[in-house]
Amino acid sequence: MASLFKKKTVDDIIKEQNRELRGTQRTITRDRAALEKQERQLELEIKKMAKTGNKEACKVLAKQLVQLRKQKNRTYAVSSKVTSMSTQTKVMNSQMKMAGAMSTTAKTMQAVNKKMDPQKTLQTMQNFQKENMKMEMTEEMINDTLDDIFDASDEEEESQDIVNQVLDEIGIEISGKMAKAPSAARGLPSASTSKASTISDEEIERQLKALGVD
């Protein structure tokens, strides 16, 4: 019972109109089929009367055939009109739904615009850009520090390689033998000691000659 008093929506009205138009189209199609059947019967009657030579009957039947064909042609016109109305109804329904969708979208956009503060949005974007720049600077500093560490390590390794090469050239190994180098040469006179001894002997001989001692 509640459905009887329920207010019809636009969609309900359009659906009813479409049902009525489809029903009208079916009726027109049936009527045209009946007229075509009568048309064939009249054509047979006219041929029959013509064979018997009944001219008056042929004239009467011919007039009926003309009227029937006019009526059949009118069914085509009516059918075309019904089809056009059905198409217009579908177009109107589509336009109505599109308008409804646009209205809903407009309301949604309006609600979003009310909640969205342009100043806050701009500030958020600026803060994001600022923090992003900080992150990039921090990352760059970390990369520079790591590069310095690795470069220093490389320089230390290069320096050690040079020291090892020099020690190897003079016959001293770095693996603990540098401490033994002085003791190994302890029994040998140094260059400075030998030179000092030579100078001392010459000085003694000079002094002896000065004294007349051979």
From Swiss-Prot:
Entry's Gene Ontology BP terms: endosome transport via multivesicular body sorting pathway; late endosome to vacuole transport; protein transport
Predominant localisation class: cytoplasm
Name of the protein described by the UniProt record: Charged multivesicular body protein 2b
Biased composition regions of type Polar residues, renumbered to the chain: 190-199
Membrane topology label: Peripheral membrane protein
Protein function: Probable core component of the endosomal sorting required for transport complex III (ESCRT-III) which is involved in multivesicular bodies (MVBs) formation and sorting of endosomal cargo proteins into MVBs. MVBs contain intraluminal vesicles (ILVs) that are generated by invagination and scission from the limiting membrane of the endosome and mostly are delivered to lysosomes enabling degradation of membrane proteins, such as stimulated growth factor receptors, lysosomal enzymes and lipids.
UniProt KW keywords: Coiled coil, Cytoplasm, Endosome, Membrane, Protein transport, Transport
